[in-house]
Amino acid sequence: MRRPITLSILILSASLGAAQVADAQDGKRLFFEADMVRHAQEGQAGPFCVLANQFKRKEAVAWRIRVLDQAGQQMDDKKLKSVVVELSDGQKIPAKWGGHPPRGTPTDFFWSLHWIIPADYPTGSLVYKVVATDLDGRTQTWEPFKREPTQLTVIAGEPTMKQ
């Protein structure tokens, strides 16, 4: 009778210890806020910096990304080694931390990057993900909804130019 009770206590202790380790690892979980907007291209008509998910070839997609720690505090370039957008075609585009708008007095700070869609890029949905790497080299990935209508989509046509 003593043996099953002792064994049960050992198993319970081991389980609680494992739960504490898991909680400690989860304590490093990051949270993401991100969107896509049309990035300003010289000669092209706006509007720019407005939400979009459909882009024509030669237009520029801009990602605006916030990475938050477990306490909800924003993580800048002193707390993260890198933030990278990885496209399903294999391209990896690094983000930069900074104030926005980039000219003038910043009203917000976040990670951002842009990608100009090549003139010969195929049309259709393009899957992407955001990978944040902390100073210890640990990574965490965020992916947007997997519904095709909400994905980044390259559509046929030419960008509208300024008159």
Predicted regions and their residues:
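Short flexible loop/turn segments that cap and initiate beta-strands
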Residues: F55, E59, L68-W97
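Beta-strand-rich domain onsets/edges
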Residues: A24-A62, R66-L68, I155-Q163
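Aromatic sugar-binding surface patches on proteins
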Residues: R103-I116, P122
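Internal, hydrophobic beta-strand segments that form the core of beta-sheet-rich folds
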Residues: L113, D120-K146
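Boundary at the C-terminal end of the N-terminal hydrophobic targeting segment
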Residues: A18-A24
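Bacterial N-terminal signal peptides
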Residues: S8-G17
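Bacterial N-terminal signal peptides that target proteins for export
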Residues: M1-S8
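Short beta-strand elements
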Residues: R138-Q163
